[in-house]
Amino acid sequence: MILKKPSEIPDVVRGDKVVALVDGKGLNIARVFSSVFGYHGYSCINILGGEVGRIIESECNAQKMKTESFWISGSNRINTALVYEYEDRMLMINEPGPIIDHEEKNSFMTFFEKKLTPGVNIIISGSAPRGFEGEDMMRLLDIAEHSNCRLNIDVAGNWLCEIVSRSPDLLKVNADEFKASFGIEKGDLRSMEEFRLSHSIKDLVITDGKNGSVWLCDLEKLRAYSSVIRSRFSVGSGDSFFGGLLYGQQKGMSHTESLRLATACGAANTISYGAAQFELCDVEKTIDEVVVRRIKC
């Protein structure tokens, strides 16, 4: 909800504009694939429940996103972002969301395994319903690894600490989350590279908002940033960045061009309110503003 001016009534918020959309890290990546690049060679698995879940499924179908729905008894959550435009700040209000029970978790594992094609790219991004614990994530990874799938990961918190022990092929992580989990400072490239090597991670991508990102791998080390900052509203920019990066890799782009495209997608996301609400023309506008350089660790 967009607030363009202060409220005249204390403790009462009346919005000036509402931007309603189905959201979630996986869905944001799917939206970048489908709506921005017209790419449909993917399937996004949603854990859905209740009336909100039915709305999510309906909107995904309307936007021609390729999704698979797994239903649970609880209801999906509604989150609200209050954008105080006149103060250039935002307040995010997140509901706790549904709880997934033991039987539902076991059913989901079977559902997930049946959907897998050996050797495909698996993207694990964001969170899961309450009750889905670290041990459940490890079971999910076991299934993926048994099918020789490439693991592309963007998670935080306890899951992040556990997943790195499984040496994902690509780990994309926010710099603040990286520091909180592993104690490595933002500018400490040498420690980042030592971390990558010690955990046998092929591609380590660390993002830092408007300050850009670094991509560390055996082939090369790169830094990228946008030379133009259009807005401080960046909700969904990390997901848009990841979507652009994955699309670039899928299309066989070089590391430099994939990172350039990813950075352009992250910047394009700030043009409009709402996660991944930009178009290809926005990416074409921002990509010339992206700087990519080789770095040394």
Which residues are covered by each model-predicted region?
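Short beta-strand scaffold segments in enzyme catalytic cores
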Residues: 2, 80-82, 212-216
